[in-house]
Amino acid sequence: MQSTVVPPGGLVLITGVNGFLASHLALQLIQRGYMVKGTVRTAESASWITEAIMRRHPTGKFQAVVIPILSASGVMDDLVKDVDGIAYVAADTSLNPDPDQVITPGLEALKVALQSATQTQSVKRFVLTSSYTAAVDTFVPSAPDALITRDSWNQTSTPRAWAPPPYDALRALDVYQSLKTESETLFWKFASEAKPSFIQNSVLPGFVVGPIIHRKQRGSTAALVKAYFDDVTCNQAFAWISAPWVVDVVDNALLHLAGLIDEDVQNERLLALAEPFKLGNFARVFEQIDPSRSWPAGDNKHGVKDEGGTKWVADTKRSVAILQRLGQDEGFTPFLESVRRTCLDSDPAWTFGNFLPKSDSQE
């Protein structure tokens, strides 16, 4: 690690800390001696995420704060006092196809957080969880081997997301892509125009896999993998997935960590994209994890198709270098190991029934 702008003992605020990525970021910070304050929307979420964090780090400094609506004016003002860094991870993942119910409040909530941060001199870093969909529109044909870089932007999802009703189910994917694109656009416009005293960074992850840390955690995209491993007939949800890349949740968290504390990482878009996504890859990895079971092969069983992958090439040299500085000798975690952790290291009490779309999702 290069020199840090926030040394151990510093306080980091994480929004939506009960979410899959956010909880792993909290664990990485606490493991390194940082204090973490995280927002949740309900007292129940505050209870179980505190249990999950403290079970792993009994002496860690962690506090969950109930904030039902992040878009309320001034709601973050008191929360950011004495905070050294902010990780804005919370996002609506409800798959609601109405852009006014997803994008509008999402942008307002981010704006509220940025404005509150400017009023607190202690804030040194602000990191936004974006998405690969802010860099590339997965529904638009692209030239073979098109290069995706930190300067790539999705310029086509937003018109489709805001087209007039009716809002059918497939519109939800355009709305999500547009939410991430518009959020990051707002984020960097704020940096350019407001010129805050703190440094801003964003992280653009792909399909995130890794261990689900509590039975009540919905698990985001990792839930689809764990459910598929538990029951080979439970793969229908993959039909919704258009992610070209997979990334381990710990690698994703570490890139956020670097954006929060690494002096060398300033005003950057970090691509958290490890390996091409391919549905058939999961069944082949499952065979290695548990060869005693019968797994789907190609198109032959349970509707599993050996499809996916990507026609894009992602320039992740910068992200790999950062991960190596943080002790990840290979850079991104290999696909086999990431899937193994998802399947075997998740809370054994977790079931796919916990993964249900909700309007208050903070994944």
UniProtKB/Swiss-Prot annotation:
Q: What is the lineage of its organism?
A: Eukaryota, Fungi, Dikarya, Ascomycota, Pezizomycotina
PANTHER family (UniProt xref): ALDEHYDE REDUCTASE II (AFU_ORTHOLOGUE AFUA_1G11360), NAD DEPENDENT EPIMERASE/DEHYDRATASE
Residues that coordinate or bind NADP(+): 176
Involved pathway(s): Secondary metabolite biosynthesis; terpenoid biosynthesis
What are the BP-aspect GO terms? Answer: terpenoid biosynthetic process
The membrane topology of this protein is: Single-pass membrane protein
Which keywords belong to this entry?
Membrane, NADP, Oxidoreductase, Transmembrane, Transmembrane helix
Q: What is this protein called?
A: NAD-dependent epimerase/dehydratase tndE
EC class of the enzyme, as a word: oxidoreductase
Q: Where is it found, in Gene Ontology cellular component terms? A: membrane
**Mind listing the GO molecular function terms for this protein?**
oxidoreductase activity, acting on the CH-OH group of donors, NAD or NADP as acceptor
Give the subcellular location.
Membrane
Q: Which organism is it from?
A: Aspergillus flavipes
